[in-house]
Amino acid sequence: MPGGRASSSYGLSVTDDKDARIWERIKDHPCFSEQAHHYFARMHVAVAPACNIQCNYCNRKYDCTNESRPGVASVKLTPDQALRKVLAVASKVPELSVIGVAGPGDACYDWRKTAATFEGVAREIPDIKLCISTNGLALPDHVDELADMNVDHVTITINMVD
């Protein structure tokens, strides 16, 4: 709405037209909205262990007690295991609204596992947001497929090669 005001169900608002369009896309996403993480849950599934670079961010640690973020995982999952885990969590956490693939390697480089996971989750929970985190090197090869899967949140990490 030109010159208008957009607001969320939890009281935040924006006034700029461009910001309003962006806000509409991120307001319910717990990774991108300061307030959304109080109302919506997200889950990362570690289905993509292969990577095309070795950076300091995704060091592919397992069971690191002090870290809980994309790139660090307790266990690698197959796409089928990830789907079962997502369905189990969704049955107990109704606020679950976002599923992301962010490693522990690169989600675009390990594409077959990432795509199979997204396809399974989207088939079972069609209204869930799908997200991906990638170093971007293999992203151009999969942009059309990501769009076809309605993956509308892509995080591109900017890291330094060791």
Curated annotation (Swiss-Prot):
Disulfide bond sites: none
Cofactor: [4Fe-4S] cluster
Binding positions (S-adenosyl-L-methionine): Y57, G105, T157
Alphabetized GO MF terms: 4 iron, 4 sulfur cluster binding; lyase activity; metal ion binding
EC top class, as a word: lyase
InterPro entries: Aldolase_TIM (IPR013785), MoaA_NifB_PqqE_Fe-S-bd_CS (IPR000385), rSAM (IPR007197)
Catalytic activity, EC: 4.-.-.-
Superkingdom as given in the UniProt entry: Bacteria
Cofactor binding comment, as recorded: Binds 3 [4Fe-4S] clusters per monomer. One cluster is coordinated with 3 cysteines and an exchangeable S-adenosyl-L-methionine. The two others probably act as substrate.
One of the GO BP terms on file: nitrogen fixation
Residues noted as binding [4Fe-4S] cluster in the record, renumbered to the chain: C51, C55, C58
Residue ranges of every copy of the Radical SAM core domain listed in the record: 37-162
Biological pathway: Cofactor biosynthesis; Fe-Mo cofactor biosynthesis
Keywords from the UniProt entry: 4Fe-4S, Iron, Iron-sulfur, Lyase, Metal-binding, Nitrogen fixation, Plasmid, S-adenosyl-L-methionine
Gene3D superfamilies referenced in this protein's UniProt entry, alphabetically: Aldolase class I
Function: Involved in the biosynthesis of the iron-molybdenum cofactor (FeMo-co or M-cluster) found in the dinitrogenase enzyme of the nitrogenase complex in nitrogen-fixing microorganisms. NifB catalyzes the crucial step of radical SAM-dependent carbide insertion that occurs concomitant with the insertion of a 9th sulfur and the rearrangement/coupling of two [4Fe-4S] clusters into a [8Fe-9S-C] cluster, the precursor to the M-cluster.
PANTHER family: FEMO COFACTOR BIOSYNTHESIS PROTEIN NIFB, FEMO COFACTOR BIOSYNTHESIS PROTEIN NIFB-RELATED
Family in the record: Belongs to the radical SAM superfamily. NifB family.
Protein name, entry field: FeMo cofactor biosynthesis protein NifB
